[in-house]
Amino acid sequence: MRKTVLVLLALGCGIGIGGSAYGTTKGLSQIVTPDLQSAGDLSLSFQAQNMKIGNPYELQGELGLTKWAEVAVFKGFKPNELIFGTEFGLLQKEPWLLSAGFVSWSPHSHIDPQPYLEAGYWSEHHKVIVGAIHVGYRNEAILGYAYDFNKKWRAQVDFQSGSGNSSTLGITWNITDDFQMNPALYVTNDKPHDILGYVVFTYTFHLWNKEKARDNEKAGAE
């Protein structure tokens, strides 16, 4: 659920189109990812996107509670709404990951939570995601792939089946160890296959994960 992308936190998974899954702050562009936010890390994000993707302006927060659980909150402005998500790590032994949770629960907008199950293969450079999500009355497939060139640059693609969703192509740029930017293009599943823009900026605070914060400071000094 990282993110990216959340991304964001889904307090990632990009994370969605038309009320579908929201990527989180450290996941891919559209979908939730099966890797969890580190315990004690709080990621805050600002997201801007085409209105056909979802709420055009959002604030996001994603908090790692333990090594196997995280929560996410999304604050939208047009319309004014709060969206909740959570993720639980059923298996977190890299390279193999298995996670479950829900995204896109908006009591204010009377939108029910959308449960999902995802498996991932997480190596140093290659990240592969396969899963499914239940949206309303239907089940939708989730697919994603990312390639980490180094600690600063990642290229990523993802797909969620169903009307109102998209295929996406994006990058993640880790400007510093704690600040990142993720721009992406969405190509809608529905004809005429519109191309839509999306960008999210994320900063991560290490609330009670001080050891990781010190490691980041040392890496930056080097």
Question: What are these regions, as identified by a protein language model?
Answer:
Residues M1-T4:
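Positively charged n-region of N-terminal signal peptides that target proteins for export
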Residues L6-L8, S29:
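Short helix-onset patch at the extreme N-terminus, typifying the N->h transition
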Residues L8-G16:
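Bacterial N-terminal signal peptides
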Residues H134-G136:
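Surface loop/turn motifs at the tips and blade-to-blade linkers of beta-strand repeat domains
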Residues A21-P115, G120-H126, Y145-G162, S166-E222:
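Transmembrane beta-barrel domains of Gram-negative outer membranes and organellar outer membranes
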Residues N139-G144:
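General zinc-binding finger modules coordinated by cysteine/histidine
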